[in-house]
From Swiss-Prot:
Binds 2 [4Fe-4S] clusters. One cluster is coordinated with 3 cysteines and an exchangeable S-adenosyl-L-methionine. The gene is miaB. [4Fe-4S] cluster 2 binds at C155, C159, C162. Residues 3-117 form the MTTase N-terminal domain. Catalyzes the methylthiolation of N6-(dimethylallyl)adenosine (i(6)A), leading to the formation of 2-methylthio-N6-(dimethylallyl)adenosine (ms(2)i(6)A) at position 37 in tRNAs that read codons beginning with uridine. Monomer. Keywords: 4Fe-4S, Cytoplasm, Iron, Iron-sulfur, Metal-binding, S-adenosyl-L-methionine, Transferase, tRNA processing. The lineage of its organism: Bacteria, Pseudomonadati, Pseudomonadota, Alphaproteobacteria, Rickettsiales. Its main location: cytoplasm. [4Fe-4S] cluster 1 binds at C12, C48, C80. This is tRNA-2-methylthio-N(6)-dimethylallyladenosine synthase. It is found in: Cytoplasm.
Length: 455
């Protein structure tokens, strides 16, 4: 008899990937995903510790799950808040049955079996054996048109605002062989696009036949897998950009022209306090090199405003950087102290009112740039991977896809929309849609691969 598994996942793409991995490893035990917590025999909350009040959001979610769960169902807390809180989860929510950190999710089958015997279980260790060494690609099922593939985890940078090194552990890279095995399995299931994931994905240093490979070299190898037509990677750190990756952007047509490269601040003074280990000029040099490698590249970034000690001059330096680069899209947040990080101990905290004011000004500028980038696509022909009709509007003759710059594209089509799914088309952009999306029509009946570019 099939048992229900309900997972509520918060935060980054890595958590989404981990949640899918949990589905894979529990499937042999008879579990299958369900859409409602009240139908589940296991309810799992996969948490993120990066954003503000992460722990409070967890306990609020747990309160809901407690009310909804059926008799005998287990509640599991996973992810980075589980790693950070540990035993405190049981103290604040004694109805929780299992607490497991992100690097120990491969132990869930054992933890669950023990928990069914009325004994609470916890594993928040950083085990010597990686979860990737335990979880076989044979367990993978089809992930759809686009799929995440984790290639690197953890962080050794220790930015003073960030909890990731403490919750995800040190940097670890999967072997090239393991990555390729997963990509091939996904391609066999119909996946056309893979997104290579890592906390610092461009710090990748996996081995292949005894030799260490970097991310640029891995990308070229992934591009050789039959059926894979698009490759992306996220998230990068400026310190780990290297010539091999630039070359991949210049010469590998399957690597999409989009890079997410967080800078956090445009002030050298703030960057030093953040322990970012790069300067504004070094970041700008990276941007220039990326644009030289691929002239149509779309750039995105992360920004934190109101970091302790940030002055108005520091903030204006961030605004100047944004104006100079011209981002296609970006994410911006007010600084909030994270317990256990050096930034939380700094005394010169910026008043909340000032943080809010700066965030509003920055987001207005970033949104203006995003709109300009969207409008610049009108009249152009873009390569679109059709995902299906799930994201489309109510029109029966419309499909939804993503451009090579990851913009949502709605396409008017003839015939059955289902026949367009999981294929790449050249699309003429006719107009801007809602929320920075595009609308267009297929300009050729020929299904095309992402076109090679020339410099």
């Amino acid at each position: 008899m099939t048992k229900g598994l309900y997972i509520e996942s918060y935060g980054c793409q890595m958590n989404v990937y981990d949640s899918l991995m949990v589905e894979d490893i529990l499937r042999p035990l008879g579990f299958a995903a369900v859409q409602r917590p009240e139908d589940a025999d296991i309810i799992m909350v996969n948490t993120c510790h990066v954003r503000e009040k992460a722990a409070e959001k967890l306990y609020s979610a747990l309160g809901r799950m407690r009310m909804l769960r059926k008799e005998g169902a287990l509640i599991v807390v996973a992810g980075c808040v589980a790693q950070a809180e540990g035993e405190a989860v049981f103290e604040r929510a004694p109805f929780v049955d299992v607490v497991v950190g992100p690097q120990s999710i491969h132990t869930l089958p054992e933890l669950i079996m023990k928990a069914t015997r009325d004994a609470k279980q916890m594993n928040v260790e950083f085990p010597a054996i990686s979860k990737f060494d335990v979880i076989s690609t044979d367990l993978l099922v089809s992930r759809g048109v686009s799929a995440f593939v984790s290639v690197q985890e953890g962080c050794d940078k220790f930015c003073t605002f960030c909890v990731v090194p403490y919750t995800r552990g040190p940097e670890y890279s999967r072997s090239v062989e393991d990555v390729l095995a997963e990509v091939r399995k996904l391609a066999d299931g119909g996946t056309k696009e893979v997104v290579l994931l890592g906390q610092n994905v461009n710090a990748y240093h996996g081995t292949y036949k005894g030799n260490e490979w970097d991310l640029g070299r891995l990308i070229r190898k992934v591009a050789e897998v039959e059926g894979i037509e698009r490759i992306r990677y996220t998230t990068s750190h400026p310190r780990d950009m290297h010539s091999s990756l630039y070359d991949a952007h210049k010469h590998e047509p399957k690597l999409l022209p989009c890079v997410h490269l967080p800078v956090q601040s445009g002030s050298d003074s703030v960057l030093r306090k953040m322990n970012r280990k790069h300067s504004v000029q070094e970041y700008m040099d990276i941007i220039d090199t990326l644009k030289e490698a691929r002239s149509d590249i779309a750039l995105s970034s992360d920004f934190i405003v109101g970091f302790p000690g940030e002055t108005e001059e520091d903030f204006e330096a961030t605004m100047d950087l944004v104006r100079h680069v011209g981002f296609a899209t970006s994410y911006s947040f007010k600084y909030s102290p994270r317990p256990g990080t050096p930034g939380a101990e700094y005394t010169n905290q910026v008043p909340e009112e000032e943080k809010s004011s700066r965030l509003h000004r920055l987001q207005h500028l970033l949104l203006t740039q995003q709109r300009l980038f969207t409008k610049s696509m009108i009249g152009k022909t873009v390569s679109v991977l059709v995902c299906g009709t799930e994201g489309s509007r109510s029109c029966s003759n419309e499909v939804f896809g993503k451009s090579e710059h990851m913009q949502p594209v709605y396409i008017s089509v003839d015939g059955d929309p289902a026949g367009y799914r999981n294929k790449i088309f050249s699309v003429k952009v006719l107009e801007e849609g809602a929320r920075s999306s595009l609308k267009g029509i297929i300009c050729t009946d020929t299904i095309s691969l992402p076109p090679p570019h020339s410099m």
